[in-house]
UniProtKB/Swiss-Prot annotation:
Encoding gene (name): Tktl2
Domain of life of the source: Eukaryota
Function: Plays an essential role in total transketolase activity and cell proliferation in cancer cells; after transfection with anti-TKTL1 siRNA, total transketolase activity dramatically decreases and proliferation was significantly inhibited in cancer cells. Plays a pivotal role in carcinogenesis.
Binding locations of Mg(2+): 157, 187, 189
GO molecular function: metal ion binding; transketolase activity
Residues that coordinate or bind substrate: 39, 263, 323, 350, 421, 429, 479
Organism: Mus musculus (Mouse)
InterPro entries linked: THDP-binding, Transketo_C/PFOR_II, Transketolase-like, Transketolase-like_Pyr-bd, Transketolase_BS, Transketolase_C, Transketolase_N
Residues under site feature: Important for catalytic activity: 39, 263
Top EC class, one word: transferase
Protein name per the record: Transketolase-like protein 2
Named cofactor requirement(s): Mg(2+); Ca(2+); Mn(2+); Co(2+)
Taxonomic lineage: Eukaryota, Metazoa, Chordata, Craniata, Vertebrata
Active-site residues, record numbering mapped to chain: 371 (proton donor)
Entry GO CC: cytoplasm
């Protein structure tokens, strides 16, 4: 494709871009030298790419990096963070002297970028995830904001071995994300040796083309070729573009360029000054280029009206699965705010997110069976507060995306996860479908609220609370139908449990959630007929846990607690309760949980086989009382 007249570049512009690239190299070398760690060679391979992107191609407001109309940039190869910080020194947002505090505890210029910095949308550094997040940003720009901003993602060639990269490539082409450009920094070298394809740019190109992408192979150190390729990419419709840049690690550094064993090593201090002087001698001007301003056409949005529009419609005793109640609540939530979106991994007819899709099809994203990418896409969609994202699949399959979820926490995201088909109550499908580790996983995530509703009414409240809660949330839903135990007027608060059965003569406090709460209620009724009374607590949120209610109830019942959960013992409800009462010497906790890998069977059979049915609760209560 020939360049249009306005895309032609003057020689002085090209020289300024090359000079900027070399200044970026110098900043990266000095910063990593100052902290005696970091990745200057990985920075040097992308210096021209970064110079062209930020000072020629991208449109953004220098003084407002978070502006909704700015082009987006994701540094998927997060170890090259120093050169990103160097860019913002050249832009004027960071003092050059601050670079010398790179990686120091009092400085936000960390070893890998995080959103502590206003110009970073998502944390990176765990490789292979940046493109998925960029897909979410691009999808939001094209389909929700319907805006002009574009998204650029810079990746390393080593990380292209990650399967999540190819999940993202498939997603982007399926949804025709022509506002997305992925840049492969093909510098040949990985951390401990060569990358698998080394400099075979033709293979990268064929693979990207096979995934439905428009492609350009360029010399990644030729600023004019880069400018032309980015301009061409902007003209392409209905396809994302992959720019495959042949580069050299450590470019511009004598005896280091394209040499192995320099990954993650700063330049020796006795050589650094000489290297910097050499690069400075290549710089012909101190001029800079002013980025083009963005096209301001993103809609102005508000999240303040994300409220429960009406009370739940369920009646006491109605039988409905919490997974179905989730779908119905989500559809209702979607009516209150047009920025509520839902992502699912080809399980919408099981998680019941299909109810939302039927009412709001334009806000439903089918991510197919690619859970890692689904989480990254949601992360991208939620950046800059553009959407309220719910992500649903079987809870067992969310474990596959634990690293993406972990990085979401580092990114300070507000994604809401919903995992269905939890525990042995899944039944005949067997252990591969049963989430028995999910509570442990989400409890370990910083600032993550963990909901475990026990009926349809509490599920609806959990959905609305999650939508309005800062940080990540996880809602655990179950497959079998359970009875509605709360009236429509019942109020729910994060961190407050419900004492749903009590008397003045209770002997034991039994704590459950989900299906085991209903087993506890059955046990309580049968025990009462035998003259034994127990207190039953519905936790509602596992994190934060209502320690006050638990301790008060335990002290009122002789210091005796029994926890019962459809989850492995490790990391579940029992351990959470034990932690909550750890400073109470007179309280004893007995845990009923799944203790081995289960098998197929009817839900009731499995609850009984693995010791968490009403029968086992009754036996545990009697044993406790007898002691």
């Amino acid at each position: 494709m020939a360049l249009a007249r306005d895309a032609k570049l003057e020689s002085d512009t090209l020289q300024v871009l090359q000079d900027v690239a070399n200044r970026l190299r110098i900043h990266s070398i000095r910063a990593t030298c100052a902290c005696s760690s970091g990745h200057p060679t990985s920075c040097c391979s992308v210096a021209e790419i970064m110079a062209v992107l930020f000072f020629h191609t991208m449109r953004y407001k220098q003084a407002d990096p978070e502006h909704p109309d700015n082009d987006r940039f994701v540094l998927s190869k997060g170890h090259a963070a120093p050169i990103l910080y160097a860019v913002w020194v050249e832009v004027g947002r960071i003092c050059e002297s601050d670079l010398l505090n790179l990686r120091k505890i009092h400085c936000d210029l960390e070893g890998h970028p995080t959103p502590r910095l206003s110009f970073v949308d998502v944390a990176t550094g765990s490789l292979g995830q940046g493109l998925g997040a960029a897909c979410g940003m691009a999808y939001t720009g094209k389909y929700f904001d319907k805006a002009s901003y574009r998204v650029f993602c810079l990746m390393g060639d080593g990380e292209s071995s990650e399967g999540s990269v190819w999940e993202a490539l498939a997603f982007a082409s399926h949804y025709n994300l022509d506002n997305l450009v992925a840049i492969f920094d093909v510098n040949r070298l990985g951390q401990s040796g060569t990358a698998p394809l080394e400099h075979c740019t033709a293979v990268y190109e064929k693979r990207c083309q096979a995934f439905g992408w428009n492609t350009y192979v360029v010399d990644g150190h030729d600023v004019e070729a880069l400018c032309q390729a980015f301009w061409k990419a902007a003209q392409v419709k209905n396809k994302p573009t992959a720019l495959i840049a042949k580069t050299f690690k450590g470019r511009g550094i004598p005896n280091v360029e394209d040499a192995e064993n320099w990954h993650g090593k700063p330049m020796p201090k006795d050589r650094a000054d000489g290297i910097v002087k050499l690069i400075e001698n290549r710089i012909q001007t101190n001029r800079n280029l002013t980025p083009k301003p963005p096209i301001e056409d993103s809609p102005r949005i508000s999240m303040s009206n994300t409220k429960m529009t009406s009370l739940p419609v369920y009646k006491l005793g109605d039988m409905i699965a919490t997974r179905e109640a989730y779908g119905l609540a989500l559809a209702k939530l979607g009516q209150s705010n047009q920025r509520v979106i839902v992502l699912d991994g080809d399980t919408k007819n099981s998680t019941f997110s299909e109810v939302f899709k039927k009412e709001h099809p334009e806000r439903f994203i089918e991510c197919f069976i690619a859970e890692q990418n689904m989480v990254s896409v949601a992360l991208g969609c939620a950046t800059r507060g553009r959407t309220i994202a719910f992500v649903s699949t079987f809870a067992a399959f969310l474990t596959r995306a634990f690293d993406q979820i972990r990085m979401g926490a580092i990114s300070q995201t507000n994604i809401n996860f919903v995992g269905s088909h939890c525990g042995v109550s899944v039944g005949e499908d067997g252990p591969s479908q049963m989430a028995l580790e999910d509570l442990a996983m989400f409890r370990s995530i910083p600032n993550c609220t963990v909901f475990y509703p026990s009926d349809a009414v509490s599920t609806e409240h959990a959905v609305y609370l999650a939508a309005n809660t800062k940080g990540m949330c996880f809602i655990r839903t179950t497959r079998p139908k359970t009875a509605v135990i709360y009236t429509a007027e019942e109020n729910f608060v994060i961190g407050q449990a419900k004492v749903i059965r009590q008397s003045a003569v209770d002997k034991v406090t039994v704590i459950g959630a989900g299906v085991t709460l209903h087993e506890a209620l059955v046990a309580a009724e049968e025990l009462s007929q035998q003259g034994i009374f127990i207190r039953v607590i519905d936790l509602f949120t596992i994190k934060p846990l209502d320690a006050v209610t638990i301790i008060q109830s335990a002290k009122a019942t002789g210091g005796q607690i029994i926890t019962v959960e459809d989850h492995y013992r490790e990391g579940g409800i029992g351990e959470a309760v034990c932690a909550a009462i750890s400073r109470e010497p007179d309280i004893v906790v007995r845990q009923l949980a799944v203790t081995e890998v289960p098998r197929s069977g009817k839900p009731s059979e499995l609850l009984d086989m693995f010791g968490i049915s009403a029968r086992h609760i009754i036996a545990a209560v009697k044993d406790t009382v007898m002691k």
